[in-house]
Design a protein with these regions (language model features):
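Nucleotide-activated chemistry modules centered on ATP-dependent adenylation/adenylyltransferase
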Residues: 1-32, 42-341, 345-356, 360-539
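Conserved G/P- and acidic residue-centered "switch" motifs that form tight phosphate/ATP-binding loops
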Residues: 38
Length: 539
């Protein structure tokens, strides 16, 4: 590193610290630092704590409360959550030792809002770019809940974020759009009475690493280890910080991003793959499980053909110039071409499709489903196509994962955890309880979660009968036989039994009757409603 660069970074750091001091001392509005464990949030957190320690030496009065929060989604990359936990503990010890008004904590989603409750419990499709349900529920909501509690106590708050200009064009546009001219703070996008301060906004990536590697972490963290994590996540292609401009175009060393190990928003998890290639081989089963989830997302055999609320919708099918219909390959789903052969529509696998044509095509398709007692909660595709008056063709849209697929997901997850060559816990027992509660609502009365768990673990874990209704296999067979004899939907009957059990002992039947009515509406009445054509509106 040149002397000139040394002077440049020193001047930048000095200017940044002076700005932090001025803003900190000007009022008593509490600060909330968002810490993710990455380089930028680590830099922002460290430079603020370094500045507070300087103010302490300067005998300045430190009366403003500084909160540091980190969102643990409970599916974070293992090495990152370990770093976060050590950092939070280290910061709290430092604050206590130096009498700093700093308090660090980890926030988490409620168990029923977590990844496994939504994916395996409710059957949400794996997150992708168009249906990214995970971020709000698992990361933003817990942080917002904490922020709201601080605002409720103090009236307002300032969020400190490690965002920088030059990270991306979209990030730069966001920063520009929320900047208030002549002010130190930016507008918060969603929360009233809160503002955003970005102390390292003018830092480059090299500035961040220069600061971290030139200044020892005040709470005892290892910034060299952090840099190694970034290097490992990129297959061990470690590179020096100060590179030529040509070198910088060829590598992204030190510019990686960490996320959830189970993330399916990207097609390939380069970070997890990089860790494995760098020698952390016990992560391989996690990558295998993640890749399997990615592969089955659009597998029609593993998805319901209705929404969780019982309604159905139709998705447009692409039509070729010769009139053939084509369902594109996606994930494990093979490409399927449907041809009109002398009035019969037959696909690439020799299967016939039922086609309903005209302005009443949707209504006729719904009637067909009801009359033939087709269970849309199963994976089997009823092979229904409608041709509307616009001359376009549509097929049934996909809904949540089927209950059987969710059982398969849990089985593979617990098998992965049981065979993992590391004590890291992939799913908490509290999450298993939530999954069983949700499965009960889907008609699972066998306590399947506990049964699956016992295949891999011989401990005292059990799900209380207070949380679920448990029937023996003999009970279920008898109930099923009765339903067959009376020509009644066995699955619906089990779900109605669940409702009765939930409201047992209530002095009034009003709520029970409302729940029963809603369930019947889900199963039959919603089928009569007009469907939508957005394939990601599963719920």
């Amino acid at each position: 590193m040149s002397i000139l660069n040394d002077l440049d970074i020193s001047k930048l750091v000095e200017t940044t610290k002076n700005k932090i001091k001025r803003i900190y001392l000007q009022d008593n509005i509490p600060w909330i630092i968002g810490y993710s464990g990455g380089k930028d949030s680590t830099c922002a957190t460290q430079i603020i704590i370094d500045t507070l320690l300087e103010l302490k030496k300067e005998k300045s009065k430190l009366s403003k409360k500084v909160y540091i929060i980190s969102s643990d989604t409970m599916v974070e990359t293992p090495m990152i959550i370990n770093t976060i936990e050590r950092t939070i503990n280290g910061i709290n010890s430092l604050a206590k030792k130096n009498n700093l008004p700093v308090e660090a904590s980890i926030v988490r989603p409620d168990y029923d809002r977590g990844f496994w409750a939504n994916l395996i419990g409710r059957g949400y499709p794996c997150p992708n770019q168009t249906f990214r349900w995970c971020t709000d529920r698992m990361k933003i909501e817990p942080a917002n809940k904490f922020t709201e509690s601080v605002i409720g106590e103090y009236g307002e708050a300032v969020m400190i974020l490690g965002v920088r200009e030059g990270e991306s064009n979209s990030r730069d546009r966001v920063l520009e759009n929320h900047t208030i001219e002549g002010k130190d703070f930016m507008r918060h996008t969603t929360q009233a009475n809160s503002y955003v301060f970005a102390p390292i906004r003018q830092f480059t990536k090299d500035d961040v690493w220069n600061y971290l590697l030139s200044n020892k972490s005040p709470w005892g963290g290892d910034n060299e280890e952090l840099f190694k994590l970034y290097s490992d996540s990129l297959s061990g292609e470690e590179c020096p910080i100060m590179m030529s401009e040509e070198d910088k175009k060829k590598t992204t060393c030190g510019n990686s991003r960490f996320g959830c190990w189970v993330c399916t928003v990207v097609s390939e998890d380069k970070s997890l793959t990089g860790f494995i290639r760098s020698g952390i081989t016990w992560l391989k089963p996690l990558l295998d499980y993640r890749n399997w989830l990615y592969s089955i997302r659009d597998d029609e055999d593993k998805r319901m053909k209705r929404r969780a609320n019982g309604s159905i919708y139709f998705c447009k099918i692409n039509k070729l110039e010769n009139g053939d219909l084509v369902i594109s390959a996606k994930g494990n789903r093979s490409k399927n071409i449907i041809k009109n052969l002398n009035g019969e529509w037959v696909d690439s696998f020799g299967t016939k499709w039922n086609v309903f044509v005209g302005d009443k095509s949707e209504e006729e398709a719904r009637d067909y489903i009801v009359k033939n007692n087709i269970d849309l909660t199963l994976g089997e595709n009823p092979k229904i196509i409608i041709k509307k008056v616009d001359e376009e063709f549509y097929q049934l849209g996909l809904g949540p994962f089927t209950l059987e697929t969710r059982k398969e997901m849990l089985t593979k997850l617990l098998m992965t955890q049981a065979n993992l060559e590391h004590p890291h816990q992939l799913i908490k027992q509290e999450e298993l309880v939530e999954i069983q509660k949700l499965w009960k609502e889907s008609g699972d009365l066998e306590n399947s979660v506990e049964k699956i768990y016992k295949k891999f673990y011989n401990d005292d874990f059990s799900i209380s009968s207070d949380d679920i209704t448990v029937f023996s296999n003999d009970d279920l067979k008898i109930l099923n036989d009765i339903c067959v004899e009376k020509d009644f939907d066995a699955k619906l009957f089990m779900e109605l039994l669940n409702i009765e059990r939930d409201f047992a002992g209530y002095s009034s039947r009003v709520e029970a009757q409302r729940a029963i009515k809603n369930k019947l509406s889900q199963e039959y009445l919603a089928l009569r409603e007009k469907g939508e054509t957005n394939e990601d509106k599963y719920y």
